[in-house]
Amino acid sequence: DGRIISQVNYSELPDDICTLDEALDACVPMWVNVEIKNDPEEPDFDISESIADETIACLVRRPEGDNRWLISSFRRETIDRCQELRSSIATAWLTVGVRPEEFNEVLSGLVKSGHSALHPWVNFVTQETIDACHQHGLAVNTWTCDDPSRMAELISWGIDGICTNVPDVALQVRDQASPS
């Protein structure tokens, strides 16, 4: 209806919009990547990073433990804040891509800031990207790959995770790529 969700009281939201807690309840016992949307171009942009504080507070209150979560965001400041608040919860930087001449410096910066993964756009990922991340101790989880042949290629290169709209296809590709 055009309202900005972050500016609406929960009691006024439609029933089909859930809280983070409710969404996480639905995901038990899965490992969950919580993506924080905090883009300066969005009407609900939060320069104070209180969204990071609220997300960490929600995850810490839950009984499952910190190793069940990974927090990702396109905004480095957001994941940096999450890392400052709770270093035991894994964090990852989402990116469309990084200039080749800056790539190693970016990876070193992610490691220095305590982040555990890079989440690059699927068209940015190469064997060299994955190898460089792994050499820095970072996992690589790409987004959004729905093409089975590209999934197979990424798996053969050692990708750690694939975000997809077709999880059934991804599981088939993974199972075919893995020796029995």
Kindly give the residue locations of the regions a language model identified:
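An active-site metal/cofactor-coordinating segment within enzyme catalytic domains
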Residues: 1-31, 36-46, 50, 90-95, ...
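Alpha-helical scaffolding within the catalytic cores
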Residues: 17-23, 76, 101-105, 126
